[in-house]
UniProtKB/Swiss-Prot annotation:
InterPro entries: Fatty_acid_hydroxylase (IPR006694), Sterol_Desaturase_Related (IPR050307). It catalyses: a long-chain fatty aldehyde + 2 NADPH + O2 + H(+) = a long-chain alkane + formate + 2 NADP(+) + H2O. Aldehyde decarbonylase involved in the conversion of aldehydes to alkanes. Core component of a very-long-chain alkane synthesis complex. Expressed ubiquitously. Keywords: Endoplasmic reticulum, Lyase, Membrane, NADP, Transmembrane, Transmembrane helix. This is Very-long-chain aldehyde decarbonylase GL1-8. GO terms for biological process: 4-alpha-methyl-delta7-sterol oxidation; sterol biosynthetic process. Residues 114-249 form the Fatty acid hydroxylase domain. It comes from Oryza sativa subsp. japonica.
């Protein structure tokens, strides 16, 4: 109850001092940037400093210059593409029912809507991502994202502007359909950013979510997608693995994992 009261007080401060447009556009952008860079920078530093190397999925590492190139382009993309899109999308979300007033939605509403967003996003993302691995779309659009065959957290949003628009639809489809409270939208965005950063981190730790959450892909699952030739990579899902399992696009990954496990047990 105290936590809920604290959230309500903090939210009241925000809606008193800022307009809904400011919160939904600039506030959303600043929250995204904060969560993205704060969660993405650690894996960059781990790789650069050689920390936690026993948990690194690939032995290869990106050079500091190659890492810096990613960061500079990300800032450019975010300011020139993401920020204008966030500002321009406010009217659309408002039309679809976005609100920011008190009271905040009950936690059961937040949880159920966010779960729906994850499931819907995963379904749309799978087919969109799979389409991006067709020859023409890969060569002209998706190859930008795959410039980093050894991913680290920040590479999760390193992509061609057309891909940002194309796959970004999967992320906003759920909120656009339900017209959620801005608070719910922020919870969804934070969790989705943390998920994609972890999936691109390049590290699999004992505490990684995939060790505890059924059907969750995680870093190992997506790292394979980056290091294999684009026509054979599979593993197209964003968060969960059931779509790849249903359509057989994870078969090569599972074979590789089985062989790696066999080799590992040989040396025990």
């Amino acid at each position: 109850m105290m936590a809920a009261a604290g959230l309500e007080s903090a939210w009241e401060y925000l809606i008193t001092h800022f307009s809904e447009f400011q919160l939904a556009s600039i506030g959303t952008f600043l929250l995204h940037e904060s969560v993205f860079f704060l969660s993405g920078l650690p894996s960059l530093l781990f790789e650069r400093l050689g920390l936690f190397s026993k948990y690194k999925i690939q032995k290869k590492s990106n050079t500091p210059d190659y890492q810096n190139r990613c960061v500079v382009r990300l800032v450019l993309y975010h300011v020139c593409v993401n920020l204008p899109l966030t500002i321009l999308s406010y009217r659309t979300f408002k039309f679809m029912g976005l609100r920011s007033t008190l009271p905040l939605p009950h936690w059961t509403v937040v949880v159920s809507q966010v779960l729906f967003f994850f499931v819907l996003e995963d379904f749309i993302f799978y087919w969109g991502h799979r389409a991006l691995h067709t020859k023409w779309l890969y060569q002209h659009v998706h190859s930008v994202h795959h410039e980093y065959a050894t991913p680290f957290g920040l590479t999760s949003e390193y992509a061609h502007p057309a891909e940002i628009l194309f796959l970004g639809f999967a992320t906003v489809a759920g909120p656009a359909l339900t017209g959620p409270h801005l608070f719910t939208l922020w919870v969804w965005m934070v969790l989705r950013v943390l998920e994609t950063v972890e999936a691109h981190s390049g590290y699999h730790f004992p505490w990684s979510p995939s060790n505890f959450l059924p059907l969750y892909g995680g870093a190992e699952f997506h790292d394979y997608h980056h290091r294999v030739l684009y026509t054979k990579s599979g593993n197209y899902s964003s968060t969960f693995i059931y779509m790849d399992w249903l359509f057989g696009t994870d078969k090569d990954y599972r074979k590789t994992k089985a062989l790696e496990e066999k080799e590992r047990t040989k040396h025990l």
